[in-house]
Design a protein with these regions (language model features):
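N-terminal subdomain of lithium-sensitive/metallo-dependent phosphomonoesterases centered on the IMPase/IPPase/PAP
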Residues: 1-89, 264-270
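Small-residue (primarily alanine) positions within well-ordered alpha-helices
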Residues: 12, 16-19, 117, 217, ...
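Residue-level signal for inorganic ion chemistry
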Residues: 23, 48, 59, 92, ...
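Solvent-exposed alpha-helices and their adjacent loops that cap or buttress functional pockets
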Residues: 36, 76-78, 111, 129, ...
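Short glycine/threonine-rich catalytic loop with a Thr-x-Gly-x-Asp
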Residues: 48, 95-98, 185-186
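DPxDG-like acidic metal-binding loop motif
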Residues: 78-137
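Short loop segments at secondary-structure junctions
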Residues: 109-113, 123, 132-135, 141, ...
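An extended, acidic
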Residues: 144-270
Length: 270
C-alpha cells in the first residue's frame, strides 16, 4: 500500500517545480505585471495570485479531500487530516524589483504535524525538501545544519517586516551585534530557513512570521539536525508566531537574546 505522506511528498515536489517554472515566466516578463499593495512594505502581484491558483488546482485535483491554506486566497474550511500550506512567491518585493531572490514554498501538515516541506528557488535551480523522519535534501543531497560553535562563526538570518517595530528588532540586534554576531537578510524568510538547513546560515530568527513562510523550512532544519522553538501548528497557521531555529550551539547562544519575542504581539495593519 502506498504511504499517503510519501504520495504527497512526490506531488509537492512536482507541483512546486512546475509552479516555480510558471513564476519564472512572470519574473522574466515582470514589467507587464499588475502589482498591488496589501500594506506597508507588503506587495502582491498577479504572479502571486496566479501561481497560488495553479498550486491549489493541482492539489485539489490530486487530493480533493485535503484542506488548503494559502497566502493570497486564505483557508478552506473543510476539516481534513491533511492540510497544505502555500506561499506562491516568498520574496515578492524582490520579485517585482527584479532581484533573483525568491522561492515557491509548499508544506503539508498531517493531524497537526508538519510532515512535508518543499522550497524551490528557480533562479539558482535549488530544490529543497524534507519528509518527517526521513531527512532533508538539496538537489538530492542530504542537508545538515552548520557545525558552528557560536554566534562568532558564520552569519544568521534575521527576518523583519512591518508587523515588527524597529525598537523590537533592536532588542535583539543590539546585544547580538555587540557579541560579535553578523546577520543577513534577503527578504525571503523561507529561503533563509532553507539556507539554515543547508548549513549556509547558522540560524534564523524573526519576531513574527506566517505559517506559509516558515513551516517547510522549520521541518528542513529539524530533519537536518537543527534546534528550534516548539510551536503549535494550528496557532501558527491561523496567527503566525515568533521563531528561532538553527545549529544547536548557535541556537543555544541566541535563545536568551531572542526570548523577548515569545510574548511579542505583532502590529496589525487594517
Amino acid at each position: 500500500m502506498t504511504d499517503p505522506i510519501d504520495t504527497r511528498l512526490s506531488a509537492a515536489k512536482k507541483i512546486a517545480a512546475e509552479a516555480a517554472d510558471l513564476a519564472m515566466e512572470y519574473f522574466n516578463n515582470r514589467d507587464a505585471l499588475l502589482i498591488e499593495s496589501k500594506g506597508p512594505q507588503d506587495m502582491v502581484s498577479q504572479a502571486d495570485k496566479n501561481v497560488e491558483l495553479f498550486v491549489r488546482a493541482a492539489i485539489e485535483q490530486n487530493f480533493p479531500g485535503d484542506a488548503i491554506v494559502g497566502e493570497e486566497y486564505g483557508r478552506t474550511e473543510t476539516p481534513a487530516d491533511f492540510t497544505w500550506i502555500i506561499d506562491p512567491i516568498d520574496g515578492t518585493a524582490n520579485f517585482v524589483a527584479g532581484i533573483p531572490t525568491w522561492c515557491v514554498v509548499i508544506s503539508c501538515v498531517y493531524k497537526g504535524e508538519v510532515v512535508v516541506g518543499v522550497t524551490v528557488d528557480p533562479n539558482h535551480n535549488d530544490h529543497y525538501w524534507a519528509r518527517k523522519g526521513q531527512g532533508a535534501y538539496l538537489n538530492g543531497k542530504r542537508m545538515a545544519v552548520s557545525n558552528a560553535k557560536g554566534i562568532g562563526e558564520g552569519s544568521i538570518g534575521v527576518g523583519y517586516c512591518s508587523r515588527i517595530t524597529p525598537e523590537t528588532l533592536m532588542t535583539f540586534l543590539d546585544p547580538f551585534l555587540k557579541r560579535g554576531g553578523m546577520y543577513y537578510r534577503n527578504a525571503s524568510g523561507a529561503l533563509m530557513l532553507a539556507y539554515v538547513a543547508a548549513g549556509r546560515l547558522t540560524a534564523y530568527h524573526e519576531a513574527h512570521i506566517n505559517s506559509w513562510d516558515c513551516l517547510a523550512g522549520l521541518l528542513m532544519i529539524e530533519e537536518a539536525g537543527g534546534a528550534f522553538w516548539p510551536y503549535n501548528t494550528d496557532t501558527m497557521m491561523r496567527h503566525g508566531s515568533a521563531i528561532l531555529a538553527g545549529a544547536p550551539a548557535v541556537f543555544a547562544e541566541l535563545e536568551p537574546l531572542a526570548a523577548y519575542a515569545k510574548d511579542y504581539q505583532p502590529i496589525k495593519h487594517s
